[in-house]
Structures are given as structure tokens and as C-alpha cells.
């Protein structure tokens, strides 16, 4: 608009100069003179110029014939007064070119609106230095020394170490000529050594960063926007789930800012009885506690795309209500302070879309889970620090115990469907890595809050359950090999995916490495490599594998509180030794399992979506079936070595030995008695056992409150037509009731008249054994029972007392 007005003004002025029109009327002459003066100042809007000129002239000599010189003097005075009102004492210092540009852009404020002019001036450059407004300025540029990206630095050190070790092996093998089999063997070595080197590098970075005095600045306690605490579940133990949620709700209610949260339980359970158990536990949980932090329960009618689809459906329906969401797993437990701090940090960093909290393992009872706990407690913080520094703002997402910015998630994280059929095509199983990569691709930051504590998860207690979980994760991680080459992903996101897939491919690669190495050694007329080279390579390999454990041990020993929390220096050292020996013992078993998993996936096997068992009740036959293949492989290996390569029997004993003993080893690893025996002597002790957090104790105490009694189960079975039909279908056909007709009639009438709580265990058993009685009771109960209590708890359960504070 200003440009059009300026063009019209120029055309009018040019026309006047060409025609040399004489101006005879004094009033017209004065108005024209004032208009030209205002136009010269910079007002390009001719209509505005004429209006102001007429106003000034008429106000100069009202009722008399104005003179041009008086009108100009009045105009100059008006301009000076206006500029002084806007700029104060510095009005005379205004750059004229700046003033012309300002008046051309904002003619509406001139000589009329002082406050509006002041506001416009504030965003229109520097009036005294003559600088143009920011949108018309060149931006200051700086030339900094180029720095290599962190992902490149992170791969450089492992790459150099791996290249050196591989070159040494190839050089030793090539003394008598390098065969194709030897070249393949060297490539397999490079893969395994490189993967171990990345772990060593990450641990080393985390180890040295632990001595840094730099601390994350404290956040300011401000009012938080509305946020959701979301827990997706599928056929989980409802007592466990809702006890943890009540404990977290209590913790949030005591934390400043915690009242900004609302809790959601997102169920995908399909078993009607499981769903009824969840609803019973929810009714009890929702009826107690702090009403300012509401708890909601939702069960999907159709559970598409598993956990990722469960969360996606929630965010699409209700995500607009929340700025942030903290996502939990069914075994998650987080302090209220940790939950609030995650959101506060995201509030202070508007480019962060996802903030992952470190995970602490707890509640392990078996030897297997306690050994994993110890490894995570000693080396976990160091690895987390190293990964946080290496990945920087392109960190990874573990799938739970993390805060997300809902708008960024909705904007970037609609998971695509991979071309082709499962297992490597179709829906993406491991959504966490992919969501982090999509956020980074869109320019958002994904970070790890490595300094936080108070965020726990549980491990599968037995070896078969651990392998079953790895089966699901492996298929998802192998899909990542396709996603990692997608266009636009950040380099660090590709590294996360490739390393994650390599961790599962390491099993079959290691087995192939052992087989080819044994064949080469058995068929060679001389030793495959000299003893000196073999010793150097073995030492380098041991360093990469044991280095992280040693660094973690040193770091924990140097930290007084951490050392004492692990039982003291002696017990800590013994625990690390026991854990290292245990890990080396079960490594061949996991190698065979991962090999079978990868081969099954490559042959088209598709994982089934089953519930995660979190109890250490592994049956003997389950372990026998799981470890039978490993046992057979171990027996075949030692037999073939004895027949064709006897000198290698002792060398490869650490591999075939555990395989031969796979079944008893898996039994011991999955047993609670072995874990408790070591715990009795203080071995494998972790801080969560020596000083259990109040939140963990509270969640354990609350389980008794969320546990359903038999009368509640019986009530739901009678009232719910789906549960009733499922129960009747399981009864043997034409089976006689458990009691006499008279006993059955008395139980039916008592149930109809007094309700489920009045029945004894024998009466409930009698009624549930007779299909016709259950159908009759279903009709009568809806007529006579107070069914309002079916939807809301009739009795308000009393919370157990909170643990006394120290």
C-alpha cells in the first residue's frame, strides 16, 4: 500500500512540474505548501497528506485567509511536538532517512497517535543510528571453525580400533595366502569386534564425563500446562498396574506442579476375564486417593497395531487436551518429582520433543534378573551418560518412562506401513526408535536426562521369558534395517537403528565365526595364527568386552554412597565377578536363541502378540523345550571337535560347555532360590534393595487394596453376559452339579436374596459348577442385586498406612 501511494505521489509531482500550473488562491497555496512539506518528510499516502495539510491550514488562521509561510511554521511546530512526544529529548537526533522510511510504513500514527507510534518504533530498527527494521537488515554472520559431528566422532574411535585389530588378523592370516574362507572369517571378526568397540567407547565417554563438575541447571517451579500420564497395558496383572499408578498419583499430589497431570490406563486386553479384573482394580483405584489428579480407564474395541496403535488412538482422540504426555510401560514406576521435572525441562526447552529418563532395574528375584540388575546398576549410569553426550540432541527413545511433546508427536510420528509382508514388512513393531528418528528428521530434539533418578522398570524374571521378549524386539529391530536407509533421517538416528539390529545379528554371526574358525583350524596343516598374534587378539577382544564392566566398577567404587549401597567394596567386587562369570556362561545360550530367532524371521516367521509374564514361575518343561536345541548343538560341537579337531576341544569349552548344560543352567538362572542364596551373602546387591525407595514400598503395600476378592469375581461373572457365556462354555457338557439339588436350590435362593458377599466359598463353587443355575442367577441378579455397585465400588476401600518417613 505504501509503495502504491509513493508511486501516485511521484506521478502527481511530475505532472505538476510539467504543467507549471499557477496557484492563485492563498488557501490552496498554503495547503499545497504544507502537503509538499509533509510529503518530503516521508509520508507517501497522498490522501493522508492532503487530510493533514487541510487540518493544519484550517487550524492556523481560522476565519481568515491563511498565508503559506504561517501554515508551514504551524506544520513544523506540529511535527516537532509530535517527535518530542514520541522520542523525548533525542527527537533532534533522529536520522532523516530512517524517519522517511518509518513515516512511509506507518503514516496512520503521524501527528495523531503517540502511543501507537511508540509501539511501532520499537520494532522498526534504530532511529538514531539509522538502521533499517530487522526484516530489512542483513543478518550478522559468524565464521566458526568446522567441528566434526558427534556421531562421526563416536564412530571414529571404534572404527580405528576395529580396523587395526582386523588388519592385524588379516596380516597374520595372509602369511600363507588368504583364502576366501579366511577373508569371510576376518569380516565376521570385524563385525563382532566393531560392535563391542562401540560399547567400550560409549562406556569410556560416560566414565570420564562422570568426573565433570558441570551440572544441569535447576528448573524454575512454574505452573505446568495440562499433561497426561499414560500407561498402555495388555493382559497385565491389574493389581500390580493399579497399585503402581495409585502410588505415582500420591507422589504427584505431593509434588509442586503434579496437579497438572491426568492419568490414563489404555487397555488392549481381549480376554473378557482379564478385562473384568482390570475394571475391578480400576474401580477400586479410582475411588480412593487425590481427586485433583483424575484416573481414567479405556479399553479399545479393536486393538490394531498393538502398543503403537493403542497410543496412537489415544493421542488422536484426546491428545488435543494435553501439551505433554509421560508414557509408561506396564511395569514402570516413576517418582512424582521425576515426572514433573521431565515436563519442566521440556517447558524450558521449546525445541525438545522427547526427553527420556534413565531406567533403573528393580524387583529382581531370580539369579538371571538379579545379575541383570547388578550390571545395570554398576554400568548403566555410565552408559547413559556416554550415550547422552555422544548422541546429544539426536538421542534415542526407549518406548516408556519418557516425556513427549504431544503436538510434535502428532505432527511427525504417524508410523508408515512398510512395503511387503511381515515379518520384515507391514506394521512397524518397534515404534520407539522410529518415532525418535522421525522427530529428529523434522528438526525436533530428542534428549536423555541422564542426571535424573527415580525411574524404574522390571526385567523378565526367567530366561525363557527374556528370550520371548527378544523375539518380539528382534523382528522390530530387523525392520529398522529397512527404515535406516530412508531419505532425510539424521545420521545418528541411522546409527541407533543399525547398532540395535546388529545386537541381534551378533548371535548368528558369532556362531558362524566359531564354526568357520573351527573348520579352518582343523583343516590347516599349521596353526591358523601364531600364538603371539592369537594372544594379542584375545587380549584386545577381552578388553572391549570386559572394559565397560571394569570402568563401571571403578566408577562405583569411587562413589562413596553408591559403593555402600551395593554392600561395600568387597561385596561389590565379588558381585561384579559373579555377574561377569554368569554373563559369560549364558552368552552361548543367548547366541543360539538369537540365531534361531533371526533364522525364523528370515524364513517368514511372524511374532505373536502375547502378554509379558513378570513372575518367576517358569515350568520345567518350558525350559526343556526352550534349551533342547542348544543342548543338541553343544553335544554335536564337542563330538565333532573330538573327532576332527581334538586340540580345539579345550579352547572352545567356554562355548560348548554351557550349551551341553543349557537345561540345568537355565533352571538355575530362572530360579528364585539361587538369587536369594546370593542375596543372603550380599552378592548382586543393588541400591534398590539396601535402601528401597518409599515409592516402591508404597506400591508394594497398595497391591492388597487393588486385589479383587472371590465375591467380586463371582459378582462380575453373574452380571456380565460375556463372562457368563465364557464360563458356561468351559463347563463339561452333561456334568452333574457339585452338590445335591436341595443344596443347589438353597445356594441359588441365598445368592438371589442376600447377594454375592453372603455366599461361602463352597456355595460359590456349587453355583459355578451348574450352568443352568448361573443362567438363572444372571436373570435374577439384575432384578434384585444393587447393580449400581457393579459400576462403582459400593464400599470405599481404605488405603493402607503410608510408610513412616525417616
Can you say where each PLM-predicted feature lies in the sequence?
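Σ70-family region 2.3-2.4 aromatic/basic alpha-helix that recognizes the −10 promoter
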Residues: 67-97
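Cytosolic/matrix-facing juxtamembrane and C-terminal tails of multi-pass cellular membrane proteins
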Residues: 331, 667-734
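A short, charge-rich alpha-helical start-of-domain segment used by transcription regulators
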Residues: 6-36
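Conserved RNAP core-binding helix
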Residues: 45-63
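N-terminal membrane-anchoring/stem segments of glycan-assembly enzymes
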Residues: 106-221, 500-530, 545-552, 647-679, ...
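Membrane-cytosol interface motif
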Residues: 214-232, 566-582, 683-692
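Basic/Trp-rich segment in TM-proximal cytosolic loops or flexible interdomain/linker regions
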Residues: 126-158, 174-183, 212, 216, ...
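Internal catalytic domains of large membrane-associated glycosyltransferases
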Residues: 201-488
Amino acid at each position: 500500500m505504501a509503495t502504491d501511494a509513493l508511486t501516485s505521489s511521484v506521478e502527481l509531482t511530475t505532472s505538476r512540474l510539467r504543467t507549471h500550473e499557477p496557484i492563485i488562491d492563498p488557501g490552496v497555496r498554503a495547503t499545497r505548501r504544507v502537503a509538499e512539506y509533509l510529503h518530503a518528510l516521508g509520508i507517501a499516502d497522498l490522501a493522508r497528506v492532503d487530510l493533514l495539510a487541510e487540518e493544519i491550514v484550517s487550524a492556523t488562521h481560522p476565519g481568515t485567509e491563511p498565508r503559506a509561510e504561517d501554515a508551514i511554521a504551524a506544520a513544523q511546530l506540529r511535527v516537532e511536538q509530535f517527535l518530542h512526544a514520541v522520542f523525548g529529548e533525542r527527537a533532534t537526533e533522529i536520522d532523516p532517512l530512517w524517519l522517511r522510511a518509518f513515516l512511509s510504513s506507518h503514516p496512520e500514527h503521524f501527528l495523531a497517535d503517540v502511543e501507537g507510534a511508540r509501539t511501532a518504533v520499537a520494532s522498526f530498527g534504530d532511529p538514531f543510528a539509522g538502521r533499517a527494521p530487522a526484516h530489512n537488515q542483513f543478518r550478522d554472520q559468524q565464521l566458526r571453525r568446522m567441528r566434526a559431528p558427534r556421531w562421526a566422532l563416536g564412530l571414529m574411535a571404534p572404527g580405528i580400533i576395529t580396523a587395526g585389530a582386523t588388519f592385524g588378523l588379516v596380516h597374520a592370516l595372509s602369511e600363507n595366502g588368504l583364502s576366501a574362507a579366511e577373508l569371510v572369517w576376518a569380516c565376521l571378526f570385524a563385525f563382532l569386534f566393531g560392535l563391542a568397540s562401540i560399547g567400550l567407547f560409549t562406556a569410556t565417554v560416560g566414565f570420564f564425563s562422570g568426573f565433570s563438575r558441570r551440572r544441569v541447571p535447576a528448573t524454575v517451579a512454574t505452573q505446568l500446562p495440562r499433561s497426561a500420564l499414560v500407561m498402555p497395558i495388555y493382559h497385565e496383572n491389574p493389581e500390580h498396574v493399579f497399585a503402581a499408578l495409585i502410588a505415582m498419583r500420591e507422589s504427584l499430589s505431593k509434588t509442586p506442579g503434579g496437579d497438572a497431570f491426568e492419568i490414563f490406563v489404555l487397555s488392549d486386553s481381549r480376554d473378557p476375564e482379564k478385562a473384568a479384573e482390570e475394571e475391578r482394580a480400576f474401580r477400586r483405584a479410582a475411588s480412593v486417593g487425590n481427586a485433583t489428579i483424575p484416573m481414567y480407564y479405556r479399553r479399545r474395541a479393536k486393538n490394531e497395531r498393538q502398543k503403537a496403535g493403542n497410543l496412537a488412538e489415544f493421542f488422536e482422540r484426546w491428545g488435543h487436551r494435553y501439551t505433554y504426555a509421560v508414557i509408561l510401560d506396564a511395569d514402570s514406576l516413576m517418582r512424582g518429582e521425576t515426572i514433573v521435572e521431565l515436563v519442566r525441562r521440556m517447558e524450558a526447552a521449546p525445541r525438545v520433543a522427547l526427553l527420556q529418563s534413565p531406567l533403573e532395574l528393580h524387583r529382581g528375584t531370580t539369579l538371571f534378573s538379579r545379575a541383570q540388575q547388578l550390571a545395570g546398576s554398576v554400568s548403566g549410569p555410565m552408559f547413559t551418560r556416554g550415550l547422552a553426550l555422544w548422541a546429544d540432541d539426536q538421542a534415542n527413545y526407549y518406548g516408556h518412562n519418557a516425556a513427549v511433546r504431544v503436538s510434535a508427536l502428532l505432527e511427525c510420528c504417524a508410523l508408515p506401513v512398510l512395503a511387503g509382508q511381515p515379518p520384515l514388512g507391514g506394521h512397524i513393531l518397534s515404534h520407539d526408535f522410529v518415532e525418535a528418528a522421525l522427530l529428529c528428521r523434522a528438526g525436533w530434539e530428542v534428549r536423555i536426562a541422564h542426571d535424573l533418578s527415580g525411574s524404574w522398570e522390571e526385567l523378565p524374571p526367567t530366561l525363557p521369558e527374556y528370550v520371548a521378549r527378544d523375539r518380539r524386539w528382534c523382528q522390530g529391530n530387523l525392520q529398522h534395517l529397512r527404515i535406516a536407509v530412508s531419505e532425510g533421517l539424521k545420521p545418528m538416528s541411522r546409527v541407533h537403528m543399525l547398532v540395535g539390529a546388529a545386537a541381534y545379528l551378533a548371535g548368528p554371526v558369532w556362531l558362524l565365526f566359531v564354526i568357520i574358525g573351527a573348520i579352518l583350524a582343523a583343516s590347516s596343516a599349521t596353526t591358523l595364527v601364531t600364538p603371539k598374534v592369537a594372544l594379542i587378539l584375545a587380549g584386545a577382544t577381552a578388553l572391549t568386552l570386559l572394559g565397560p564392566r571394569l570402568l563401571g566398577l571403578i566408577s562405583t567404587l569411587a562413589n562413596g554412597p553408591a559403593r555402600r549401597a551395593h554392600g561395600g567394596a568387597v561385596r561389590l567386587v565379588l558381585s561384579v565377578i559373579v555377574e561377569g562369570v554368569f554373563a559369560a556362561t549364558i552368552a552361548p545360550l543367548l547366541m543360539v536363541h538369537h540365531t534361531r530367532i533371526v533364522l525364523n524371521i528370515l524364513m517368514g516367521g511372524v511374532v505373536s502378540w502375547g502378554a509379558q509374564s513378570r513372575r518367576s514361575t517358569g515350568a520345567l518343561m518350558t525350559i526343556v523345550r526352550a534349551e533342547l536345541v542348544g543342548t543338541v548343538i553343544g553335544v554335536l560341537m564337542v563330538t565333532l571337535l573330538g573327532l576332527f579337531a581334538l586340540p580345539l576341544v579345550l579352547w572352545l569349552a567356554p562355548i560348548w560347555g554351557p550349551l551341553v548344560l543349557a537345561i540345568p543352567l537355565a533352571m538355575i538362572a530362572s530360579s528364585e532360590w539361587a538369587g536369594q542364596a546370593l542375596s543372603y551373602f550380599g552378592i548382586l546387591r543393588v541400591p534398590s534393595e539396601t535402601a528401597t525407595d518409599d515409592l516402591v514400598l508404597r506400591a508394594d503395600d497398595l497391591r492388597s487394596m487393588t486385589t479383587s476378592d472371590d465375591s467380586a469375581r463371582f459378582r462380575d461373572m453373574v452380571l456380565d453376559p460375556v463372562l457368563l457365556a465364557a464360563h458356561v462354555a468351559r463347563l463339561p457338557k452333561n456334568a452333574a452339579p457339585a452338590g445335591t439339588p436341595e443344596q443347589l436350590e438353597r445356594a441359588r435362593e441365598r445368592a438371589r436374596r442376600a447377594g454375592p458377599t453372603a455366599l461361602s466359598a463352597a456355595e460359590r463353587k456349587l453355583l459355578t459348577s451348574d450352568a443352568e443355575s448361573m443362567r438363572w442367577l444372571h436373570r435374577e441378579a439384575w432384578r434384585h442385586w444393587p447393580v449400581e455397585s457393579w459400576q462403582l465400588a459400593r464400599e470405599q476401600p481404605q488405603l493402607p498406612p503410608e510408610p513412616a518417613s525417616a
